[in-house]
Amino acid sequence: TMIPPLAYIATPQEMDEMLTSEKPKLALDNFWLERTGSIERSKELIRIYYNRTLFSNYYFTSYKAGWLTDRGMVYIMYGPPDKVYKNAEGESWGYKRPPVKSRWGSRYTYEDQYLWFNFRKQKSLFSDNDFVLNRAGTPVSYWDIAVARWREGKVFRLDNPQELR
C-alpha cells in the first residue's frame, strides 16, 4: 500500500490512524491535503514522494523493500544525490549545500560543499544489494528540517539556503 512509506514523515499516531482506517485511501489523501491545503499541490507532492519510493524499490531492494533500506530512506527524503562514488566496500552520496562565500584579500570565492552519506556494503546470504548507512559519519544531516519541510507540504532541497533555516 501507499501508507507504510510515509513512516519517514508521519507521526506514529498518524500512521496508526491511516493503517487502521476503514477508508485508508481517504485517510491517505487527507494526510497530504493537511500538509498542503490544496488538491493540486497534494498531487504534486504525492507524485514526487511516491516516484522516489518507486525508484527506491527498483534500485535498492535487497532482502527487504527498497524504501525500507537506508539508501531508500535517504533517497526518498533528499532526492537523487548530486555525486555518487562507489567501490567494493560501499557507496558515498553527496548532496550539494549552498555555496560558502569566503573572502581572500579583495576577492570573493565560492566553495561548493556537500553533505555526504556513506553506505557500507553488507555481506548477506540473501542479497548482494544490502548497504547500511554509517550514521556516525554524517554528524549534520538536516534530517529534522527535511521532515519538517515535507510535513509543511514542501519538497526538501538541500541546495536551497532558505531550507536550512
What are these regions (language model features)?
Residues 1-165:
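Residues within mature, well-folded domains
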